[in-house]
Amino acid sequence: MVTIRLARGGSKKRPFYHLTVTNSRNARDGRFVERVGFFNPIAAGAEVKLSVNQERVSYWLSQGAQPSERVAQLLKDAAKAAA
C-alpha cells in the first residue's frame, strides 16, 4: 500500500521531517517514491514551518495513497492556511 508519511531528518534534538510518498513496507527513512513537502516543528521567526506541494499530494491521494494520521492533520492545516 502506498502511504504519505513523515521521514525524519535533522540532527539530534533538532527534528526536521520530509513528507514522502512511499510503500508502507519500506523503512521510515528508507526508499521513497517522491518527496512532496517538509515540516519543521521547531521553526522560529521567519522560517517556514510547513511546505506542501498540494498538486502532487492531491494526485497521490487520487491514486489511492493513504496519509498517516499526522500527515492528514498537516494537510488539513496547510489547506486552511492556503485558503
UniProtKB/Swiss-Prot annotation:
GO terms for cellular component: cytoplasm; small ribosomal subunit. This is Small ribosomal subunit protein bS16. SUPFAM superfamilies: Ribosomal protein S16. It comes from Pseudomonas putida (strain W619). PANTHER family: 30S RIBOSOMAL PROTEIN S16 (PTHR12919), SMALL RIBOSOMAL SUBUNIT PROTEIN BS16M (PTHR12919:SF20). Belongs to the bacterial ribosomal protein bS16 family. GO terms for molecular function: structural constituent of ribosome. It holds the Pfam family Ribosomal_S16. GO terms for biological process: translation. Keywords: Ribonucleoprotein, Ribosomal protein. InterPro entries: Ribosomal_bS16, Ribosomal_bS16_dom_sf. The keyword rRNA-binding does not apply. It comes from the Bacteria. The keyword Methyltransferase does not apply.
